Amino acid sequence: MKTPELITDPAAWQARCTAAREAGTRIALVTTMGYLHEGHLSLMREARRRADAGGRRGLAVGTIFVNPTQFGPTEDLARYPRDLEGDLAKCAAAGLDAVLAPSDPALMFAPGHETWVTVERASQGLDGASRPGHFRGVATVVAKLFNLTRPHVALFGEKDWQQLAVIRAMVRDLAFGIEIVGMPIVREPDGLALSSRNAYLSPDERRRALALSGALAEAREATARGERDAAALRAGARARLEAAGGRVDYVELVHPETLAPVARAEPGTVLLLAASFGTTRLIDNGRLP
């Protein structure tokens, strides 16, 4: 198992990726904030496969950067879990060739940085309402990583459904020419969606957080029985979360592409959930049948 090349300087990373692309190498990218779990690794394994899809070995790469610009002033930037050594071992097992892990946030956002990417419609509501400025930070750092890496394909998890919509809109509107691939949510055997923030949960909070996947399962069962009224489905999901002691941020049924709220759940409608258990805010989602 080969250890991936670790690059800590974005300029050196850009030179490395530019040389590879100019040599005709296909590049696949996975962006992360580190503290990797099986959800991230599923993206990296798929990046390896897609990088090599052209008939020759490509370049499968990842980034590890806890982006300060996507955290609000009261959020968990300082305590966000970090384990670079462990992450690199996982990247090696997943088959990555190289990893960018900037040694200083100022290398990505220098003093005087004044350029931001705002995706208007997709950033509104949901996490955009609960976390002002979050998607501006996400879109800006992803745009910068795209410019530094110039990948042919980039992979993102569907657990962050709104984030995926934001990135797809940005790539479309700014003509990045990158294929964006959304990958399914990876769950624990008991249904909890994998998240780096699960590390914050106490055993009791983790048990109660299973209400997220439980609410999704109940909504699927209800629609399978013929319930299509969005208000009724929202009410059922909210009740499940509140019964488990969750502090509900939002429960919404939306069109899978536009994120527009719907009055009636059609096949493929997405149920989006956000709730806190203890001090840990978690999100989850699922398509309805």
Curated annotation (Swiss-Prot):
The active site is at H40 (proton donor). The keyword Cytoplasm applies. It is an enzyme of class 6 (ligase). It is found in: Cytoplasm. The reaction proceeds by a bi uni uni bi ping pong mechanism. Catalyzes the condensation of pantoate with beta-alanine in an ATP-dependent reaction via a pantoyl-adenylate intermediate. This is Pantothenate synthetase. It comes from Anaeromyxobacter dehalogenans (strain 2CP-C).
